[in-house]
UniProtKB/Swiss-Prot annotation:
GO terms, molecular function: alanine-tRNA ligase activity; aminoacyl-tRNA deacylase activity; ATP binding; tRNA binding; zinc ion binding
The gene coding this protein: alaS
Record-linked PANTHER family: ALANINE--TRNA LIGASE, CYTOPLASMIC, ALANYL-TRNA SYNTHETASE
Requisite cofactors: Zn(2+)
The protein's enzyme class: ligase
Residues that hold Zn(2+) according to the record: 604, 608, 708, 712
BP terms from Gene Ontology: alanyl-tRNA aminoacylation
Annotated source species: Saccharolobus solfataricus (strain ATCC 35092 / DSM 1617 / JCM 11322 / P2)
Family: Belongs to the class-II aminoacyl-tRNA synthetase family.
GO CC annotation terms, alphabetical: cytoplasm
Keyword Oxidoreductase found: no
Protein name: Alanine--tRNA ligase
Length: 900
């Protein structure tokens, strides 16, 4: 959609003598006070010329630029609110915070809940990876991490705050009065914005070739069929670039110098590369507006311009700028890594962790291309020292950040050992596509840049896309939200049936200890029963649905409830049989299986206790990745970058049991979701993100508070005690804890005692003597194993001395029969095939082990053997085969002859 000219013809522009002009280069309309201006002052229509503008403001650091912006709007009636983390954990569809408006999506922007203040101002650290390949090349125009300073106003039908004129007036006042930019240098370029299903006209504020802010007026919803429907809630969504404000006031040769100051020179030094010539950098930066990274020709033209301007050889220009761009990339990436990890990201192969690992590996790749020996964590440590006052969480989580980065580098170095074999596999392809390179990166973690050298050795050419990492990030930057109907295990026709039914009153929230109730039947569909109210808890939040009885008191018929489910606000009782004596409108009595429910309540409550204990022991990066509560045990999956030690597990267990012994009150609360977020932070969403204006929180006094819709005990003492019974790494970056509490702990102890008694009986000892008896048995086994090794050596020597090879076409064929020791077989076959042109086969009934020397291929022999039936296969020089029928030694030799 293109907005009409009237959308931009603001009273503010008319009253303040702004003129509407059309840019001679891009043909875009813009507003300016300069009658003579012909260009929109945005790149690539002009070079960067803000260096030449007389700006009255003193040079501002990022910190000073941020504070100047926030204070300016605070003085003008805006409430300053704290930024959210760079991980968008209040969203189920997005991993990273890409803009300040994300802080308020989807619930504030949809009108479901009010904003925390109106109007408000915030400076939101943001991360966008779609430009990751362009970082450094454009001297700071593209960054992966930046601060979006923003003032927002939410205009409701019954409450107008401010709109286009006031927003434009604020921008003009801030840039001209606060920063001292001459009015005639300020330009408002007409544009259109769309994102997140919303749209509206916008104005891009440009000064001297640099876009400093975007003023978006969100006023349309985009329907599925592409129509634009006016929104009732009209939102002022602005974005001012804090780093660009610092750059325009400092007039440094690159944005990196404005952002990082002396850290730029320190990074060149630590990485071990020469600093770029200052004059070259200044000239290159001035012409950098001409660079369109998606068009490699513009990079070439830019370097030719620099070469011509300075009279320097083009090769020298390219080498200097390439080297500087790589150091700038590492500056940018290490800050992004620091912020991601400080806010709790754990590098992994999926979700947000994948994106974190992508940035880390790209930084490692660049260091490798620069042939630098510096450890990445040393550079991240420098960033922590530089930003610790701006972002206190980076200092608080310093140990985790550095440990995780070093571990990732060690893993990356192991991955690089695979480069030759991966290159060999790729070299067999007739053409290497972008999809092949992405597949290799996704599967093996090997950057294509580092495959290039190996492939060149094999004289294989391939086209490496400039935006490779952006393409990879795009595939992983969002998460698919499941439809509510896809999450439940109920028939579709039932889901249609319940759409007409009223919400079920949740008695389990009024009294979690209620065991029975009376309710009215609202719907019956086969063996599914819906009541007006219930104390049966439906499956959710990892807690199993309740079971119990529905009693028809008219007929005294009792129906077993085998499960309870929920769709939206309707609770469905799943019966073992169809309720033949019950009809809609009847009153029935429900009784839950209380012993089962109480076990679930204990396991659900102790899950919260253990999660908080894990955070205390391991760090703030711990995040719930999944949970399940059954009557028998609880299960909690947490994000963590390495295996837990025995000591860490004990500490978690000790903290949890201490909280149980403390008899801490456990209290459910209901709060406005935005109020809850502002008070407790987004960590309340560890168990999932509810879609409601009011959310239910569970507070364990002075220990934990989290959004949770489950059932819990009212005091930690009711849990009794907890024991962690299993810890395992279930996938990259995820650790699973399993535990038992209350009666389930007693069951576990009894089962363990029974196993110990059985083991003692088997080896003929008592439980208290079991450890010493086992030690004696192991010593005896070890002695016998040593004897077996000696006997194997004797057998091996005898066989090797006695075996005579068959000669076929200059090849030696050895046949071993009747040796059933598989390990010994492998060792003998290996020794026999240590010289070229040798095949060794061990036969045991219809099972064959085959080995060849390195200059031969085992697969041809296997192929010939399997022609007569059977199965098997191998790799390289070794194979296992099971023939469909036993063959004589002579028959096998004959088959081998054919294969040769």
């Amino acid at each position: 959609m293109k907005a009409s000219e009237e959308e931009y013809k603001l009273n503010f522009f008319i009253k303040n003598d702004f003129k509407r002009k059309i840019c001679k280069s891009c043909q875009t309309p813009f507003w300016t006070k300069d009658d003579k201006k012909e260009y929109c002052s945005d790149i690539p229509c002009t070079d960067y010329y803000f260096f030449d503008i007389n700006i009255k403001s003193q040079p501002l650091t990022v910190k000073e630029a941020r504070e100047k912006f926030l204070s300016f709007f605070e003085k003008r009636g805006h409430t300053r609110i704290p930024p959210k983390p760079v991980l968008a954990r209040w969203r189920e569809d997005l991993y990273l915070t890409i803009a300040s408006i994300v802080d308020f999506q989807p619930h504030v922007t949809s009108g479901l809940v009010p904003p925390p203040a109106n109007p408000l101002v915030v400076s939101q650290p943001s991360i966008r990876l779609e430009d990751i390949d362009n970082v450094g090349v454009t001297f700071g125009r593209h960054l992966t991490t930046f601060e979006m300073a923003a003032h927002h106003a939410f205009n409701y039908p019954d409450r107008y705050v401010y709109w286009k004129d006031e927003t434009t007036a604020y921008a003009t006042e801030f840039f001209t009065k606060e920063l001292g930019i001459p009015e005639e240098e300020l330009n408002f370029k007409e544009s259109w914005w769309e994102g997140g299903g919303n749209a509206g006209p916008c104005l891009e504020v440009t000064v001297g070739g640099l876009e400093l802010a975007t003023l978006v007026f969100m006023q349309y919803k985009i329907t599925d069929n592409g129509d634009y429907i006016p929104l009732k809630l009209k939102i002022v969504d602005t974005g001012y670039g804090v780093e660009r404000i610092a750059w325009v006031t400092q007039k440094t040769p690159s944005a990196f110098h404005a952002i990082y100051g002396n850290l730029v020179y320190k990074f060149f030094d630590k990485i071990g590369v020469a600093y770029i010539d200052e004059t070259l950098l200044k000239v290159a930066s001035r012409f950098a507006g001409k660079i369109d990274p998606d068009n490699p020709d513009t990079i070439k033209i830019h370097r030719q311009m620099v070469s011509k301007e300075l009279g320097i050889d083009i090769k020298n220009v390219e080498e200097e700028l390439d080297r500087a761009a790589k150091v700038f990339q590492i500056l940018d990436h290490t800050k992004t890594i620091m912020l991601m990890l400080a806010d709790g990201l754990v590098p992994s192969n999926s979700g947000e962790g994948y994106l974190g690992r992508l940035v880390i590996r790209r930084a490692l790749k660049v260091l490798r291309l620069l042939k630098s020996d510096v450890r990445l964590y040393e550079l991240v440590k420098e960033q922590i020292g530089f930003w610790k006052e701006d972002f206190p969480q980076v200092l608080k989580n310093k140990d985790y950040i550095l440990d995780a980065v070093e571990l990732e580098q060690q893993r990356f170095e192991k991955i690089l050992e695979k480069v030759p074999s991966i290159a060999s596999t790729l070299a067999r392809k007739s053409e290497i596509t972008t999809e092949d390179l992405i597949q290799v990166y996704d599967s093996n973690g090997v950057p294509p840049d580092l495959l290039e050298e190996e492939l060149k050795k094999k004289r294989v050419k391939f086209e490496l896309p400039r935006n490779f990492y952006a393409l990879v990030a795009k595939r992983h930057q969002t998460s698919t939200i499941k439809n509510v109907y896809d999450k439940v295990k109920l028939p579709k026709d039932l889901l249609e049936y319940i759409t007409t039914l009223q919400p079920t009153e949740k008695l389990y929230y009024k009294d979690q200890y209620m065991r029975s109730f009376e309710g009215k039947v609202l719907g019956i569909y086969k063996n599914y029963l819906i009541l007006d109210k219930t104390t049966f808890y439906p499956e959710g939040g990892g807690q199993l649905g309740d079971t119990g009885l529905i009693i028809d008191e008219k007929s005294s018929k009792r129906y077993e409830v085998v499960d309870t489910q929920k769709v939206n606000d309707v609770i469905i009782h799943v019966l073992k049989e169809e309720p033949s004596t019950i009809k809609v409108g009847d009153n029935v009595r429900g009784e839950i299986n209380w012993e089962r429910r109480y076990r679930l309540m204990r396991h659900h409550t102790v899950t919260h206790v253990i999660l908080a204990a894990a955070k205390k022991v391991l760090g703030d990066h711990i995040w719930q990745a999944g949970a399940e509560k059954t009557p028998e045990k609880g299960r909690l999956d947490i994000t963590h970058h390495k295996a837990l030690t025995e000591e860490e597990v004990k500490l978690i267990e000790n903290y949890a049991n201490s909280v149980i012994s403390d008899r801490r009150p456990v209290k459910p609360l209901e709060m406005n979701r935005m109020e809850a977020e502002m008070k407790y932070g987004v960590s309340i969403y560890e168990g999932g993100v509810p879609n409601s204006a009011t959310i239910r929180l569970l507070e364990i006094k002075d220990w934990d508070i989290e959004s949770c819709g489950g059932t819990h005990v009212s005091n930690t003492s009711e849990i009794g005690a907890v024991k962690i019974i299993n810890v395992e790494r279930i996938q990259d970056g995820i650790i699973r804890l399993e535990y038992v509490a209350g009666p389930a702990l007693v069951d576990y102890i009894r089962e363990t005692e029974a196993k110990i008694a059985e083991a003692s009986k088997i080896i003929g000892t008592s439980p208290d003597q079991l450890p010493s008896r086992l030690r004696r048995i192991l010593n005896e086994v070890e002695k016998k194993n040593n004897l077996i090794i000696q006997y194997r050596r004797i057998v091996e020597t005898e066989l090797l001395n006695s075996l005579k090879p068959y000669e076929i076409n200059g090849n030696k064929i050895y046949i071993i029969e009747g040796l059933n020791d598989e390990e010994e077989n492998k060792e003998i076959l290996r020794k026999l095939t240590s010289t070229d042109n040798t095949i060794a086969i061990s036969i045991s009934d219809n099972r064959l082990q085959i080995a060849t020397s390195k200059n031969m291929r085992v697969d041809k022999i296997v192929e010939e053997l399997l022609k007569g039936g059977g199965k098997g296969g191998g790799k390289g020089t070794f194979a296992n085969v099971i023939l469909s029928s036993k063959k004589s030694k002579e028959e096998i030799i004959d088959i081998v002859r054919k294969s040769l």
